[in-house]
A protein has these predicted regions:
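Glycine-/charge-enriched secondary-structure boundary and capping motifs
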Residues: 1-117
Length: 117
């Protein structure tokens, strides 16, 4: 069985409340293409998989949600760490991986594990 995990699924595996979306860094033109519906079919399957655990907040951009569910956005390099350690690590990461970013914040477990803003 081949599994295509996306950022949404990797966040869900943490089993914490997580709010993210607007801070998600995107490649140039990715959002424009997603607005036109140009995303892999796996993105829709991934989104359906996490849907019971996901609350999309008012004003969230559908294209960004599609991109977060894109199997190419695997969270294999997703890191969870204490808030006070995040900025120093980010500065160090950005010296050799300038696309590194803080994409969300872990909070207490809620009825919906993920919130997309």
């Amino acid at each position: 069985m081949l599994l295509c995990l996306a950022l949404l699924e990797e966040l869900l595996r943490l089993r914490f409340g997580e709010r993210f979306g607007a801070a998600l860094p995107l490649l140039p033109q990715a959002e424009e293409l997603a607005d036109m519906g140009i995303v892999p079919g796996g993105a829709y399957r991934n989104r359906d998989y996490v849907k019971p655990h996901l609350r999309v907040l008012d004003g969230a951009q559908r294209a960004r949600l599609d991109l977060a569910a894109d199997p190419q956005t695997s969270g294999g390099l997703l890191v969870a760490l204490p808030r006070e350690d995040a900025e120093p690590l980010l500065r160090e990461l950005q010296t050799f991986a300038p696309w590194s970013a803080i994409v969300g914040e872990v909070s207490e477990l809620r009825a919906t594990a993920l919130e997309f803003d």
